[in-house]
Amino acid sequence: MGSEMCIRDRGYTFIHPFNDEDVIAGQGTIGLEILDQIPDVDVVIVPIGGGGLISGVAFAIKELNPNVKVYGVQATGAPSMLKSIDDGKIEKLDSVSTIADGIAVKEPGDITFAMCQKYVDGIVTVSDDEIAAAILALIEQQKLITEGAGAVSVAAAMFNKVDVKGKKVCCLLSGGNIDVTILSRVIKRGLLKSGRTYSLTIELLDKPGQLKGVADIIAKEGGNVISIHHERASEGSDINGCYLRIVLETKNFDHIAQIKKALTDAGFIIKSY
């Protein structure tokens, strides 16, 4: 209602963020740059919210080189364009929920819907955990900070949502507008998703030396303890037992399995995985 009042009372002009031919044409210049800088590109992966970005990029690329595959990526919690394409008509979602708030769009536009139908080779979705892992990978490997929406293209490639093996691929990173508190949470989720941190609960006998025994095994296997909580008289524990809740810094999922095996081989009971 606010925008309508500004148009009526102040003479402002409303520019739609994605369902506008001029906006789409502007986005299309990115497609031209991709072909100019990577003329032998095989696959281009683009984030999709309302569809303006991919409409312009796909139009420019397909008109100049129809052999290039253009794929769109949406968040699992906001798949409005995918649902619309699958149903053959524009669909409006009741709600959206994703850390990729820049592409959390309930309903695509009629212009962008038609262009995606014509020019986009396929649309896939990625989960919030996969997005978080992609953000972390970009920070560590490329020294780039992206928002959730900006990282979905990399997430699609990382988690094999698009066939990229043996191909020259361009992942379009569409933005870096991420709050530092959200970034902190995303990094933690990314570490969990990539097997870089792990939480477990171990049931111990309540006697001296048990905690040291666990710590020695973890250290021997190359794990690092981030936090530890020793809990007596916990609900569900034996009267002579206690729970040890540990958060570990690990290398990968194989390393986690190695530590867990060493603990169970030593007689410790892991209660949660």
Please provide the spans of the model-predicted regions:
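Gly-rich Lys/Arg/Thr-decorated short loops/hinges at beta-loop-alpha junctions or inter-strand turns
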Residues: 10-14, 96, 195, 240-242
